[in-house]
């Protein structure tokens, strides 16, 4: 793995200012590493920001962290969420849904899905506290949400209109197993259930649209992140390797 490939993942999936000359094909080729490299990095940055700001803002830090999370992502995935919301609201044939998916204007469906996301995200972030578990929660949720979105792109054929979806699908063929294996240290038994249910829902949505796309992948990252996070918080990462690691760290003297 070369430094160029690593930097390319940060340049594509985040708003972190790194220079990369990699093409979209090169980024897609090595994107299977992004859940580990980018996901863990984002989780650590968000954790440090939360723990520092908690000393000043207390329990309200979760609201500020929402802005930090979206800034780190560059609002790119949020755009996919809005587009998907508009497409889901369309009653008609596939062509009308695709037109809504590609439309730059935001309709009622996009606003509605945004409100759903914000509601879940705010609840999840306000449940965080000043503890070691917060670090592991955020790392786990970032890794899982990125892995899920790439797994969708790798296993569901893209819509003809999505160049990004086509490239990622072609480059990730045969790597879906790797994406699942990467999850093992970070996923709890309960989030396995969340992963499966979310994938089944997106599979159904992709079926109505004719395939996957970059917008669907972005929406999947955005929506699944708070779901994974709130599940981790409720279950304390039970039955995961991270929970064992967290327990050992918290009991070191």
Swiss-Prot record:
It catalyses: alpha-ribazole + adenosylcob(III)inamide-GDP = adenosylcob(III)alamin + GMP + H(+); alpha-ribazole 5'-phosphate + adenosylcob(III)inamide-GDP = adenosylcob(III)alamin 5'-phosphate + GMP + H(+). It is a multi-pass membrane protein. InterPro entries: CobS. Its EC number is 2.7.8.26. Pathway: Cofactor biosynthesis; adenosylcobalamin biosynthesis; adenosylcobalamin from cob(II)yrinate a,c-diamide: step 7/7. It is found in: Cell membrane. Belongs to the CobS family. This is Adenosylcobinamide-GDP ribazoletransferase. It comes from Saccharolobus solfataricus (strain ATCC 35092 / DSM 1617 / JCM 11322 / P2) (Sulfolobus solfataricus). The lineage of its organism: Archaea, Thermoproteota, Thermoprotei, Sulfolobales, Sulfolobaceae. The gene is cobS.
């Amino acid at each position: 793995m070369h430094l160029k490939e690593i930097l390319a993942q940060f340049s594509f999936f985040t708003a972190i200012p790194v220079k990369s000359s990699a093409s979209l094909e090169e980024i897609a080729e090595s994107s299977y590493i992004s859940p580990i490299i980018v996901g863990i990095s984002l989780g650590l940055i968000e954790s440090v920001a939360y723990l520092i700001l908690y000393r000043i803002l207390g329990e309200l830090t979760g609201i500020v962290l929402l802005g930090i999370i979206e800034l780190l992502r560059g609002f790119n995935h949020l755009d996919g969420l809005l587009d998907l919301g508009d497409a889901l609201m369309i009653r008609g044939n596939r062509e009308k849904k695709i037109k809504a998916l590609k439309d730059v204007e935001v309709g009622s469906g996009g606003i509605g899905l945004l409100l759903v996301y914000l509601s879940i995200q705010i609840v999840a972030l306000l449940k965080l506290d000043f503890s070691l578990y917060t670090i592991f929660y955020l790392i786990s949720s970032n890794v899982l949400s990125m892995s899920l979105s790439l797994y969708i792109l790798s296993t569901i054929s893209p819509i003809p209109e999505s160049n990004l979806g086509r490239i990622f699908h072609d480059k990730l063929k045969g790597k879906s197993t790797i994406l699942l294996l990467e999850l093992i240290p970070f996923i709890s038994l309960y989030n396995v259930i969340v992963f499966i249910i979310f994938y089944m829902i997106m599979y159904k949505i992709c079926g109505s649209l004719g395939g996957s796309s970059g917008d669907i992948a972005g929406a999947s990252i955005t929506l699944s992140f708070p779901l994974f996070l709130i599940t981790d918080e409720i279950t304390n990462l039970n039955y995961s390797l991270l929970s064992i690691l967290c327990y050992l760290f918290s009991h070191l003297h």
